[in-house]
Amino acid sequence: MNWWTNNKGEFNKLAKLTGPILVAQLTQMLMSVVDTVMAGRKGALDLAAVSVGGSIFVPATLLVFGLALALAPIISHLDGSNSHRRIANILQQGLYACAIVGVITLIGMSSAPWLLDIMEVEDDFRAITLDYLFYISWGIPGFVIYAVLRNFCEGLSNTMPSLIIGFIGLLINIPANYIFVYGKFGMPELGGAGCGLATAIVLWGMALSMVVYTFTAKRYKRLRLLRRWYRPNWDDVTYVIRIGFPISMSLFFEVSLFAAVALLIAPLGPTVVSAHQIALNISSLVYMVPLSISMAVTLRVGFALGAGNPKNAMLSFKLAMLFGGVFAGVNGLIMYLGGGWLASLYTPDKDIINLAATLMGLAAIFTVSDTFQAISIGTLRGYKDTKYPMILAFISYWPFGLTVGYILGLTDWVVPAMGAAGFWIGFISGLSVAAVLLSLRLRRVSRRYERKHFREQLNSAA
């Protein structure tokens, strides 16, 4: 009880950061749901085109998002050390870095026709998908601006703008989809491609909202963000890239793992694919909580280290683990006991419900491993340690997790082929290995920081 009383203040700070981030993440998921519903009501071809287009767009933008995420711990370090004069420069250098990568993303998306040719899709399907990508690509500059400014605000422990502007984006998204998908109010009827145009408008709306807030908020006036425009400093730009690129790749390894499994189980039939998708959809929704805790602990750890308090950094980690562990335990129990009921919300098909319920039982364990690895990697980002976590994530997800899943799911080498359940055991194995390896890495990094801080105290005392 005494331990809790002493540390309640830090827990409250962590919770206050986590809440708005969670709501912001959920609004982004809801935008995707709106796209899916609007396109689905238009037709199966439009829905499929939006799905494939999104599968190209999202991985393409991970590089920008990863670089922007690097700004949060960098700025939180500066905030903790009261180095506020350097924040305006690092914000602008981060914008340069993300802008460069944004151009690369646009160039990469130009390969979409080639990818669709390899897939040998129908002409109508190809046309809608390419139109979707054409329209949504206009939103990439807005996405760059929004991502940079969002992480600037969050780096200063101000997460409310993410929440409010997330709602603004959702409020723009619903009518914009309705207008452009169905051709209302004199606008052309674009079908699934209209979702791309709506998303581009949303991204620009969120970017402009974030610009207005950032450069008019009284709390940022002392930072003098517009007093001087800094030229690109390649040392600072490469510094952001050096921290952010491994974050981007870690995200890519995780996203691509789930995409690869979806392709591998596709030949097992629609029942298996549908059950897998239901379990994955629910798990993805649940993951928003540990993801938000992870992003919040990055900020608290970065601030503590900037303030020269490595012990408080590890306290934030322990409290995040406590918070995440309780959530994972309760949520895992709900998923295990109520898996069938949750699956029935998606479909009336008994075969799909039964298989999904089995997968949900595995997803309950998966959630625990996922929570611990997410919080560990978020804490390491607070230490600005991203290179080795990227390597550990790759080893855990691909050579280990996917291999275990493939052997158990599609071969008889160990047990009779388990289908989708085998791949979910692979997910659990990979994420559990990641959680252990990342925890060991964190232990090493945190001790190094504590030794360094101790030596600095001795030197200052001398």
UniProtKB/Swiss-Prot annotation:
Q: Which GO terms describe its biological process?
A: monoatomic ion transport
Example GO molecular function: xenobiotic transmembrane transporter activity
The record lists the membrane-crossing segments as 56-78, 90-112, 127-149, 161-183, 193-215, 243-265, 285-307, 319-341, 356-378, 391-410, 420-442
Example GO CC term: the record gives: plasma membrane
Q: Where in the cell is it found?
A: Cell inner membrane
Q: What are the record keywords, sorted?
A: Antiport, Cell inner membrane, Cell membrane, Ion transport, Membrane, Transmembrane, Transmembrane helix, Transport
Give the matching InterPro entries.
Answer: MATE_fam (IPR002528), MATE_MdtK (IPR050222), MdtK-like (IPR048279)
Top-level division of the source organism's lineage: Bacteria
**Short name of one Pfam family for this protein?**
MatE
Instruction: Report membrane topology.
Output: Multi-pass membrane protein
This molecule's function is given as: Multidrug efflux pump.
The UniProt similarity line reads:
Belongs to the multi antimicrobial extrusion (MATE) (TC 2.A.66.1) family.
| Designated name of the protein | Probable multidrug resistance protein NorM
